Curated annotation (Swiss-Prot):
Domain-level remarks: Domain I is involved in oligomerization and binding regulators, domain II is flexibile and of varying length in different bacteria, domain III forms the AAA+ region, while domain IV binds dsDNA.
Matching PANTHER family: CHROMOSOMAL REPLICATION INITIATOR PROTEIN DNAA (PTHR30050:SF2)
Domain of life: Bacteria
UniProt key word Nucleus: no
Segments for region (Domain III, AAA+ region): 101-315
Protein name: Chromosomal replication initiator protein DnaA
Known function: Plays an essential role in the initiation and regulation of chromosomal replication. ATP-DnaA binds to the origin of replication (oriC) to initiate formation of the DNA replication initiation complex once per cell cycle. Binds the DnaA box (a 9 base pair repeat at the origin) and separates the double-stranded (ds)DNA. Forms a right-handed helical filament on oriC DNA; dsDNA binds to the exterior of the filament while single-stranded (ss)DNA is stabiized in the filament's interior.
A GO CC term assigned to this protein in UniProt: cytoplasm
UniProt record similarity statement: Belongs to the DnaA family.
Quaternary structure and interacting proteins, as annotated: Oligomerizes as a right-handed, spiral filament on DNA at oriC.
Annotated spans, Domain IV, binds dsDNA: 316-437
MF term (GO), any: DNA replication origin binding
Keyword Protease (UniProt): no
Length: 437
């Protein structure tokens, strides 16, 4: 296969160490690839990111040298075993038409459930077990990296194991597939593929916004599947009503079944996610390190998991044990970037909303209990989440000197140590602030 030949060509251009560690871990996905798209499967996000960033352009060039066409290079996550398919062959869905591969590690068992995602998890399980009966369609919405794709794959993997026909694609892949069949005058094959499955799973459906041609095609696909009691599951970064450029008839249909959100994970859930990831990958991190990562990184689960892989990779490359100091050194730039992205105004906005105190009151010299408490919390969070110094905060709040800031910090720290509920409030405020950036 050309994809494998291209990897062998790349082998001659790079070091043996790089080839063994990264390129050798890839598998060319012939079924998902086309003349304008070359798809490789990687075992984890770290390798996928590394190959895409460092070798993506070179791989595209090597393809171009052989075929005269420069394809888009996609690195997807999945099993390296060649017999893993995204759906079971059934009449009308031929084996050669599978558009992508489900991530075998994304199952209901590997999904970490917390207050932030419990409802979406329960609804997804219900839909997986009751095709076209429980909620059809199911649309899960929420920010990037919160677990929407994990649940989508979980539904797919559960039903593949049951012998069901499953198609899982991103909305961009659906569009590219549509354009490919339009160009080749094979729309009958496209419709056979997407309208003859038991489960149609589409990720990031907000991508359809502003694209009337693909919306028209999907409208008819949706209707045919729904009329046959076939299950449709969609994800989006916003509610149907918030998707700009989406036709009203599709917005209406997306709300026919169930619309469920996923919120940023609370601290306890983040800790459990890290522990689960470490257990799955056979990586040991102390509770101290796990707590450090959960507290200092944002709420994007995908990024948190990538950090764990990065830590482990650095430790292996440098032949070092992962200690707290080692973790701090490896992650310091990412944490610095996190802190620089959060502003004092962001913090004031969130705290004022959650504690029901006006932003102007927090910035004032008002001394009522509620206002003073909110101001102390803002100061504590600003020192924790941003690069603001104590003198700069004292100046912002019109205090005499930074000793007043130090006193506010000490008061909040003491209350955190003595009151578990207050500590939880602070952690939730941190999460809400980080999720806005």
């Amino acid at each position: 296969m050309l994809g494998d030949t291209t990897l062998k060509q790349l082998k001659d251009e790079i070091s043996t160490l790089e080839y063994e560690r990264y390129i050798k871990q890839l598998r060319y996905d012939e079924e998902a690839s086309r003349t304008d798209l070359a798809v490789y499967i990687a075992p984890n996000q770290f390798i996928a990111n590394w190959v895409k960033t460092k070798y993506g352009e070179r791989l595209a060039h090597l393809f171009e040298l052989s075929t005269g066409i420069r394809p888009k290079i996609e690195i997807r996550l999945g099993s390296l075993k060649k017999d893993v398919k995204s759906s079971s062959p059934k009449a009308g869905v031929s084996k050669g038409q599978k558009s992508t591969i489900l991530n075998p590690s994304f199952t209901f068992d590997s999904f970490v459930v917390g207050n932030s995602n419990r409802f979406a998890y329960e609804v997804s399980q219900n839909v997986a077990k009751k095709q076209g009966i429980a909620y059809n369609p199911l649309l899960i919405y929420g920010g990037t990296g919160l677990g929407k794709t994990h649940l989508l794959n979980s539904i797919g993997n559960y039903n593949v194991a049951k012998g069901k026909s499953v198609i899982y694609v991103t909305s961009e892949q659906f569009l590219n597939d549509y354009l490919y069949h339009i160009r080749n005058n094979t729309m009958d094959r496209f419709r056979d593929k997407y309208r003859a499955c038991d489960y149609l799973l589409i990720d990031d459906v907000q991508f359809f916004g502003g694209k009337p041609q693909i919306q028209e095609e999907f409208f008819h696909t949706f209707n045919e599947l729904h009329n046959k009691n076939k299950q449709i599951v969609l994800t989006s970064d916003k509610t149907p009503k918030q998707i700009a450029g989406l036709e009203e008839r599709l917005k209406s249909r997306f709300e026919w079944g169930m619309v469920s959100d996923i919120q940023p994970p609370e601290l306890e859930t983040k800790i459990n996610i890290i522990k689960k990831k470490c257990e799955f990958d056979g990586i040991y991190l102390s509770n101290e390190i796990i707590s450090y990562i959960a507290t200092n990184m944002d709420n994007n689960i995908r990024e948190i998991e990538g950090i764990i892989i990065k830590l482990n990779a650095y430790a292996n490359l440098m032949n070092q044990e992962i200690t707290l100091q080692f973790a701090k050194n490896v992650l310091k730039e990412q944490i610095k970037e996190e802190r620089e992205n959060i502003t004092l105004e962001n913090i004031i906005e969130v705290v004022s909303k959650e504690l029901n105190v006006k932003p102007a009151e927090i910035k004032s010299k008002g001394r009522s209990k509620n206002i003073a408490n909110a101001r102390r919390i803002v100061i504590f969070l600003a020192r924790t989440l941003t690069p603001n110094s104590m003198p700069s905060l004292a100046q912002f709040f019109g205090m005499k000197d930074h000793s007043s800031v130090s006193k506010a910090m000490k008061t909040v720290k003491t209350e955190i140590e003595e009151d578990a509920n207050f500590k939880m409030v602070i952690e939730e405020l941190k999460n809400k602030i980080k999720s806005r950036n």
